[in-house]
Regions:
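Transmembrane alpha-helix termini and helix-breaking/packing motifs in multi-pass membrane transporters
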Residues: 39, 98, 156-195, 271-276, ...
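Substrate-agnostic recognition of the 12-TM MFS/MFS-like secondary transporter fold
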Residues: 16-35, 50-69, 76, 106-172, ...
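Alpha-helical transmembrane segments of multi-pass secondary-active solute transporters
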Residues: 47, 77, 145, 194-198, ...
């Protein structure tokens, strides 16, 4: 291919990658996620089991999918991701409301397909896009591409949150129907599947963008057995490369510490808003507002990445996370939203830095596998922290011994659990530096 054709292909892939990410993330059921599962007829225990199944699926398929992307082809993995997203939404549309065992089976299949889609897309989309830019000699533009993708993804998430919450509210829908002169009315049961249908439309766009991606043909076509054998060899080679290479080793360790503690708070955010006396109606607006930080945080991250070292940026992000975690422990009514802003900004900084540094450091043939190791490690550390947090809650309850009862007890236990997070975070930070020193001594750069 000529230089102009390579450049044209690169920017074509950038556009497709951007839309793929935006619509893969824009899931209209997110603002009513738990409520929707329960309205279908699932119990809280079933909801917890399904979330566990989803996390286990991602961890199980994460690294093999990255290695398959590096051997079978990144575009093929993206097509698999788009296909799984289509099927996971179709399963929920077909699932019977209040369908007992059959309902749980449908949701289990949905969580399995969703986990496979997440694992297949993780790393393959970035690796394909970065390699096409590198082939055109434009890899220096990757920072700006990431900035735009994060900005557009945040906008897409904002609108998905707003629209998803609105279409699930029968009062809102009935008001719109009256405004347009319609005499019909709807209730909650009529709207349960509407966010799912809208997300199915997003899945169509995701699948279309995967088909539009262009990848250089493989040097050789392998059979299934040879492909799987090479996949596992590639996984082993990449694991050894990460273990013996300073920068990716440290970046993945840092990502595990930063990502897990922030995500732990994000899963508890609605309870935190309740504790600081924010009205329930504001929760969707808060989530959308936090997502809008993606309009400027990636730009700040790009400037920091260009002007400062990875270690300096890690320390800056860690300081912001620590300040946010300490602030959460005070649970100040209304004003308690401020420390949460530090954490929402930090998760975006972390995502940008990790993606940029790993893409720049990883060899082209191993890039998707390296990025999959990132996903595996962060999901693993998040799962471990979730188990530890559950144990902490049980321990705090045993210490309370009925001193406080009812909702006040629940809130007291929750606030006390938040006060442990900054100290856990400091211990993990110390372990990062100790691990780095034991593995590489006083080395500061690769």
């Amino acid at each position: 291919m000529t230089a102009s054709e390579l450049e044209q292909t690169a920017w074509h892939n950038v556009r497709s990658f951007t839309l793929f990410r935006v619509f893969f993330t824009a899931r209209f059921y997110y603002p009513v996620y738990a409520l929707l599962f329960l309205d279908y007829g699932l119990t809280l225990s079933q909801f917890a089991i399904l979330n566990g199944l989803w996390a286990v699926t991602i961890v199980f398929f994460e690294v093999p999918s990255g290695a398959l992307a590096d051997t079978l082809g990144r575009r093929k993995l993206l097509i698999i991701a788009g296909s799984c997203m289509l099927m996971e939404m179709a399963v929920l549309l077909l699932a019977p409301i209040g369908g007992g065992t059959w309902l749980f089976t449908c949701f289990a299949l949905n969580r399995l397909l969703s986990g496979i889609a997440e694992a297949a897309a993780s790393g393959a989309d970035e690796a394909l896009t970065y390699d096409s830019l590198k082939a055109a000699g434009l890899e220096g533009r990757w920072g700006k591409v990431l900035e735009r993708v994060q900005r557009d993804t945040s906008l897409g998430f904002f609108f998905a949150m707003m629209i998803g919450a609105a279409v699930y509210d029968p009062q809102m829908i009935n008001a719109i129907l009256v405004f347009f002169g319609q005499s019909v009315s709807v209730d909650q049961s009529d709207l349960i599947k509407l966010p799912i249908f809208l997300t199915l439309l997003s899945a169509v766009v995701v699948f279309w963008m995967a088909l539009r991606m262009q990848e250089a043909p493989r040097e050789e076509e392998l059979g299934i057995r040879e492909t799987l054998a090479r996949c596992w060899r590639e996984t082993g080679v990449t694991a050894r490369w990460i273990w013996t290479t300073y920068l990716p080793f440290c970046i993945i360790l840092a990502a595990m510490v930063l990502d897990s503690v922030i995500r732990q708070f994000l899963t508890l955010a609605s309870e935190y808003w309740n504790v600081i006396n924010l009205p329930i109606a504001s929760y969707g607006l808060i989530g959308s507002g936090m997502a809008l930080m993606g309009l400027f945080v990636p730009r700040v991250a790009r400037i920091l990445a260009e002007k400062r070292t990875p270690l300096q940026n890690f320390i800056t992000t860690a300081a912001a996370v620590f300040i946010g975690l300490v602030g959460l422990g005070f649970a100040i009514p209304y004003w308690g939203i401020i420390p949460a802003i530090f954490l929402y900004a930090s998760i975006q900084l972390t995502g940008f830095f990790v993606s940029r540094y790993l893409n720049e450091a990883a060899p082209s043939k191993q890039r998707a596998t390296v990025l999959s190791f990132r996903g595996l490690s962060t999901n693993f550390s998040y799962g471990i922290l979730s188990l530890m947090y559950s144990g902490l809650i049980v321990w705090i309850k045993t210490q309370e011994r009925g001193a406080i009862v009812g909702d006040a007890s629940q809130q007291s236990i929750f606030v006390e659990s938040l006060q442990w997070l900054p100290w856990y975070f400091l211990v993990c930070l110390g372990l990062v530096f100790v691990s780095q020193h034991l593995r590489f001594g006083n080395k500061q750069s690769d």
